[in-house]
Regions:
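Short coil-to-helix segment of the ABC ATPase nucleotide-binding domain corresponding to the Q-loop/switch region
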Residues: 77-84
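Conserved ABC ATPase "signature" region
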Residues: 94-111
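Hydrophobic anchor residue at the start of the ABC signature
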Residues: 129
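Catalytic Walker B motif of ABC-type/P-loop ATPase nucleotide-binding domains
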Residues: 140-143
Length: 190
């Protein structure tokens, strides 16, 4: 349960949320990402107080990207089809060119025809990250994005997040990893 909580995150900030299991880290992230509504209180995003359902859809579609610990991919589809989902609302663009760019960005250039179930956990998380890159969102919410990964893949995924942040993206991530949280601009401890 999160009670009497006030938080302001500036554009381009890299924020870690840490705390014990059950402290509300994921709940806070989901409230900020408009995936859950708070029981009470206000949410103000880009000067919009308590966005209505239409505003929430626009924010989620156009401004927010989500990176979940469980990857949220369609396992029996190939990488390319999973990535096309992120391009659903982008018209008049070369989808293949954008997909190739996103896969190159995460080190999976030749993986577009591979089925998701053929990939390791680290590769699946990088596909999920490529999907976020394709959305060209302003804010990325990441819930334990490296929690299921070995050190090599953890470092790859985190380096990509840091690179996105250096290019102006706001990153808010939940982690139990002290080493990763220390690399954030700010750490919020619940």
């Amino acid at each position: 349960m999160i009670d009497k909580f006030n938080l302001e995150i500036s554009k381009g900030e890299f924020v870690a949320i840490t705390g014990n299991s059950g402290s509300g880290k994921t709940t806070l992230l989901n409230i900020m990402g408009l995936l859950e509504k708070p029981n009470s209180g206000d949410i103000i995003i880009n000067n919009i107080k308590n966005p209505n359902s239409k505003q929430i859809r626009i924010l989620q579609r156009d401004f927010y990207g989500y990176l979940f610990q469980n990857y949220a991919l369609i396992e029996n589809e190939n990488v390319e089809n999973n990535l096309k989902i992120a391009l659903k609302y982008q018209k008049n663009i070369n989808h293949n060119e954008k997909i190739n760019y996103a896969l190159e960005s995460v080190g999976l250039r030749k993986y577009n025809k591979k089925k998701i179930y053929e990939l390791s956990g680290g590769e699946q998380q990088r596909v999920a990250l490529a999907r976020v890159i394709l959305k060209e969102c302003e804010v990325i919410f990441a819930d334990e994005p490296t929690g299921n990964l070995d050190k090599k893949n953890r470092d790859i995924v985190f380096d990509i997040l840091k690179s996105l942040n250096k290019n102006g993206k706001t990153i808010v991530f939940v982690t139990h990893d002290l080493e990763l949280s220390e690399q954030a601009d700010r750490v919020i401890k619940l």
